[in-house]
């Protein structure tokens, strides 16, 4: 590869990283237009919200659902690699950000908020703060970057650990979240409802 080709490749990569950042910014703008609150109504920001079915859940920088978004990054990395393995890494990252941002917008729409409230244990869920939603996308991107730099087996082990740990601790994880959102199971809901208040 010549110097000119390397320069052009670097320029394309930077443009795609710019696209990823632009998608995150667009997510924030659309959430604001949807009427989402910028930060928790409590008026302050926590690094981590330890509660599950509490008013602070999904309102701060991170919470017990953050591992699920990191796993999103693992999954999106593999998916993007399958679809665009010969494309720039930064383009694949932009693709992942697009999917995550689209989900975040859907998740904070009335139809999905109502679905969470009726089909899952999240009876008091009113949607994410803009800060929390944006950080979900950031954590997905971190998971994507991590998956790009470590062996597949390590990514799989960490994903399984996250699922088992959060499943044990809060009786919820990415797998259970998808199941309860798509095809609610009463036995699982009863088990989750029996979780002691955290």
Curated annotation (Swiss-Prot):
Disulfide bond positions: none
Membrane topology: Multi-pass membrane protein
A GO CC term attached to the entry: plasma membrane
Annotated transmembrane regions: 14-34, 64-84, 150-170
InterPro entries linked to this entry: DUF2585
Compartment(s) of residence: Cell membrane
This protein's UniProt keywords: Cell membrane, Membrane, Transmembrane, Transmembrane helix
Pfam families: DUF2585
Stated family: Belongs to the UPF0314 family.
Protein name as annotated: UPF0314 protein Atu8092
Biological classification of the source: Bacteria, Pseudomonadati, Pseudomonadota, Alphaproteobacteria, Hyphomicrobiales
């Amino acid at each position: 590869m010549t110097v000119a080709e390397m320069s052009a490749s670097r320029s394309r990569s930077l443009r795609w990283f710019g696209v990823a950042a632009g998608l995150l910014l667009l997510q924030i703008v659309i959430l604001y237009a949807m009427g989402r609150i910028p930060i928790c109504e409590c008026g302050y920001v926590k690094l981590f919200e330890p509660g599950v079915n509490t008013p602070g859940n999904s309102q701060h920088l991170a919470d017990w659902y953050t591992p699920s978004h990191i796993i999103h990054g693992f999954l999106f990395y593999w998916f993007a690699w399958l679809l665009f393995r010969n494309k720039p890494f930064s383009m694949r990252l932009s693709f992942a950000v697009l999917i995550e941002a689209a989900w975040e917008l859907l998740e904070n729409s009335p139809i999905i908020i109502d679905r969470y409230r009726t089909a899952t244990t999240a009876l008091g869920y009113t949607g994410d703060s803009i800060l929390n939603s944006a950080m979900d996308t950031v954590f997905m991107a971190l998971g994507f970057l991590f998956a790009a730099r470590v062996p597949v087996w390590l990514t799989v082990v960490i994903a399984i650990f996250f699922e088992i740990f959060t499943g044990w601790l809060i009786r919820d994880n990415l797998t259970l979240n998808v199941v309860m959102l798509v095809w609610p199971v009463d036995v699982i809901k009863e088990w989750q409802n029996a979780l002691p208040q955290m």
